[in-house]
Structure formats: C-alpha cells, structure tokens
Amino acid sequence: MVNVQSFEEDKIQLISIHLLDVENDSYMNLFWALEDAIQEINSNVSSAVVLVDLSDVILKPKSLGVGYEFYFISDLISGIKFPTIGIVDSEAHLALLELFLCFDIRITNRKSRFSMSHILEGFTPTDGGTQRLPRIVGVGRAMDLLLTGRCFSAEEAMEMGVVQYLFPKDVVGEAIALGSQIAAHGPIAAQYLKEAIMNGADMTLSQGLSLETDLNVILQSTFDRAEGIQSFLNKKSPKFLGR
C-alpha cells in the first residue's frame, strides 16, 4: 500500500502509494501507513527531497464513509518539511486532483487528464479544492473548472500552473532526475526556501520580507552555509551535510 525507496544516500525519498480499493478501511490503513513513513522521512537527517507517486491511487470521497474528512492525506503531505514532488502518470480527478495540488512541484504524463467534477455528482470539494485551486490558477479559472466540472488536458494544466513538467514517458524516472537536481543543493536552504514561500504566501509583503530575513539570518549559522562560501572561494563543489 505504501512503499518507500531511497536514492543517492537517502537524499531522495520516493513514496509509491497504491490504493485501488476505495473502501473506508483501506483508506484508513493507507493513512496510518503513510503517516508512519512520513514521520520516518522527516526524522532522517539525510533526506533532502520527497517524491510521491500517485499513479496507482483512486480516491472517491463519497465511498469512504463518515470520518474521511478528519483524515486528509493532504495534511500529511503538507507536513513534509522537505520539498515535495507529486507524480501522476495517468489521470487525476476529484479528490485525487485535490491531493495532487498540495505538492510543491507537480509533474505528469502528456496524455494525462484532470477534473474537479464534484459538482456533477452533487457535492463540493472537501480536501482543499476550493482553496488551493484558485491560489494556483486564479479565481476565474477555478470558478470555471469547479462550476463546470469539465476535464482538461495535461497541456492546459501546464498552461494554468496545475503542473510544472510534462513528460511523454517514464514520469517517475524524470521525477527522480528532478529530485536529484534539487538534492544536489543545500538541503537546509531548500527547506527555508519552502518555508518562506509557503508561509509568506499568507502574509503581507512586509511580513513575508521579515520572514525571509529571519530565515536568512538563521541560515548563516549553519555548516552548509559556511561550506558553500568556502567551496565558492576555493572553486570546488560543496559537500552539504544538512546541518
């Protein structure tokens, strides 16, 4: 149900989720297994970036029963302190698209299709669809997608900012390559960048700038910052340790 693979000395963590049975018990078992996996990854000092493959996931909120709304997988994903990359190599509709939107970077197959067609079944998004989607694509486009429930292509998703990368094949392999690029940089700096962007988005510009300054000051005291400076002066590649 939840499989974790590590690459490049644990810097890249790949979580593959398998949920094709949408009954409530299966969902809850997945939730607890994923929670354990994420806690372990967050406590691993070697971790730098987390990839999550959602290609074998089906989520239909109406079939999950009472209690689903209190156990959102998206809350677990949002609690990952490292940069996250969401992977969909098929299609993402309804709650699966809502979950997909909570990742920092999203990649998909060129043939993928998406929709938030909750309204066609007489209900509304329950996992952030009405909040994350307009923040990503804008209010007007979100209104269109949510009120019509229409399907849209991977190309349109790319144009709107729903996804950042399209690949014709081997989407997981391409995601690992992207993760490798991110993991090669300072892991603490990457965490602080994520914190500044995600938290700053809900602040005024002045508050966001103050947060950016505070995180920069904290970063100055780390080993990785000193390593970066010394490597630049000595014209060699830095060896970041995440401390």
Task: Outline where the language-model segments fall.
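Terminal peptide-recognition signature
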Residues: I15, L34, V52, F100, ...
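A structural preference for short, pocket-lining loop segments at secondary-structure junctions
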Residues: D10-G65, S78-G86, I105, N109-R113
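Well-ordered beta-strand positions
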Residues: L99, D104-I105, D144, T148-R150, ...
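Glycine-rich beta-to-alpha active-site loop
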Residues: Y71-P125
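Terminal low-complexity tails and localization/encapsulation signals of metabolic enzymes
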Residues: M1-V2, Q230-R243
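Alpha-helical segments flanking ligand/cofactor-binding loops in enzyme cores
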Residues: D75, L97-E98, Q131, M143, ...
